[in-house]
Structure formats: C-alpha cells, structure tokens
C-alpha cells in the first residue's frame, strides 16, 4: 500500500456525514451510501485537500532547514481520495461491528503520533486514520479467525505484493505454504468477512469514481509496521469474495487457532 492513514478519536459527528432522505442511491455528489447515511464527495475532497496542503508545508519547512527546495513530486502526499473514503466508511462499519460483536477497542495510535509521522499534524485525516486503526486492531484481535480459500488467499497475496510486503511470483502452492503459519492472514480475513456482512446488511453503495472499498490493514514485520489495502467491495458496490468465516461452535470445543 502507500504510506498513509492512522490516528485516534473523531466522533461520528466529526465525520460530517449527511442524513439520507428518500432519494435514490446514485447521486454524483455522494461518494458512498451506508444505510441511511451518505458520505459526500465534497467531504472526501476537503479531508484530502487539508492533508495535502499540510503535508506540502511540512516538507517545505523541513527542506528549508537544510537550504533545499523540494520538487513537486516530493510535495505530493501519497494518500488519495480512495484512501479517505476507505477510512470514512471503514470507521462507520467498524463501529457498528464492534458494538454488535461486543469487541473492545482501545486507544493504541494517537492522532498526534500519526500526524507527526506522516507530516500531516492537526488534520482530520490524521484523526480518522488513528481512529480506524484502533478499530482495525480491536476487530482483528477480537473476531473469530476466518479460513482462506485459494481465491481469497490469492487476493490477499496480491494486496501484499502491491504494497511491497511480499515478493511477486508465488504459485498457489507457495501461497498456501507461506500463509499456513501466518495468523494475520486469518485475522485480517475475519475483519473482511465482518465488513462484508455489514455491507450487505446496510446496502452500501459506492460512487463509480471510486474503484473499491478497501481495508487499510497493518502488518508487523521485522522492519516494523507495514500497511496494505485489501478490497472488500468492488467499484459496483458488490462484496468481493475474500474469505469464508469459520462456523461458530454450538457446543464447547477446542479454540480455533489464531
């Protein structure tokens, strides 16, 4: 994925979501519909533009201290509007899941920490990113792990390759072998399953200008935390086939491996 999102405590009100009346679900100024709530394109643009402007100023200030002039490419924040929508919708759905499944969510990443790390201090993007990752880490730890199919394992592998977390070229058998002992694969798949369930329940619809809805996921590696995006809704508002949840036991059984 790209260097981006993280940070902790924006309320639903701070998301500036709009109440949806009895209208259709294809307005061009709406980025996404989540149940009876809409997220406007203007809102997505405003969050992105604030983060971009703040990042450019941070880069200029750092370069000035060294007597340098940054290039236009260096001034560009590696976060796009798709990333913003992923956060807005992910937080909405994640809160519903945590409440419904009684999953505890703790403050683990602060807006201040993320804002400083990414060069976007005091921005709504930093707040949203931290809030999402607190939710993500809570859901990943608190939901029952899910089993992967070859197709869903391939989707996860493709996301890791795209983020330069895994090398390209693994065969299906190699993917099975490499992921066999990796607990995170079943954990992130559990988050995907829960999000897919909410998408279907709430009739989530995405504006065609956004290619997908993705999970901004974290992975602990030997070189530190890495980030990657795992799609769970395609650009037509359809749930993707990412994983299959394990059935919940009706009688006490041995706990599932995590």
Enumerate the predicted regions with their spans.
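Exposed boundary/loop context
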Residues: 14-16, 29
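Well-structured core secondary-structure elements of compact alpha/beta domains
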Residues: 45-80, 123-147, 154-189
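A C-terminal, polar beta->alpha supersecondary segment
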Residues: 148-258
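C-terminal motif of bacterial Sec signal peptides marking the signal peptidase cleavage site
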Residues: 18-22
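N-terminal export and membrane-targeting signals
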Residues: 1-14, 81-82
């Amino acid at each position: 994925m790209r260097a981006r999102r993280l940070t902790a405590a924006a309320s639903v009100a701070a998301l500036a979501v709009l109440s949806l009346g009895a209208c259709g679900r294809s307005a061009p100024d709406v980025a996404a519909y989540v149940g009876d709530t809409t997220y406007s394109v203007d809102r997505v643009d405003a969050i992105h533009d604030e983060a971009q402007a703040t990042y450019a100023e941070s880069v200029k200030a750092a370069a000035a201290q060294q007597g340098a002039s940054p290039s236009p490419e260096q001034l560009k924040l590696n976060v796009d509007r798709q990333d913003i929508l992923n956060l807005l919708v992910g937080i909405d759905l994640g809160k519903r899941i945590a409440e419904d499944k009684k999953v505890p969510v703790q403050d683990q990443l602060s807006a201040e920490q993320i804002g400083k790390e990414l060069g976007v201090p005091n921005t709504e993007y930093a707040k949203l990113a931290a809030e999402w990752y607190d939710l993500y880490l809570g859901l990943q730890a608190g939901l029952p792990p899910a089993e992967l199919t070859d197709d869903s394992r391939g989707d996860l592998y493709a996301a890791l390759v795209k983020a330069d977390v895994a090398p390209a070229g693994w065969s299906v058998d190699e993917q099975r072998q490499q992921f066999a002992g990796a607990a995170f694969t079943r954990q992130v798949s559990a988050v995907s399953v829960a999000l897919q369930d909410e998408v279907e329940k709430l009739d989530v619809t995405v504006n065609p200008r956004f290619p997908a809805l993705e999970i901004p996921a974290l992975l602990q590696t030997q070189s530190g935390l890495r980030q990657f995006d795992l799609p769970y809704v395609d650009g037509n508002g359809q749930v993707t086939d990412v994983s299959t949840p394990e059935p919940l036991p009706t009688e006490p059984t041995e706990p599932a491996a995590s």
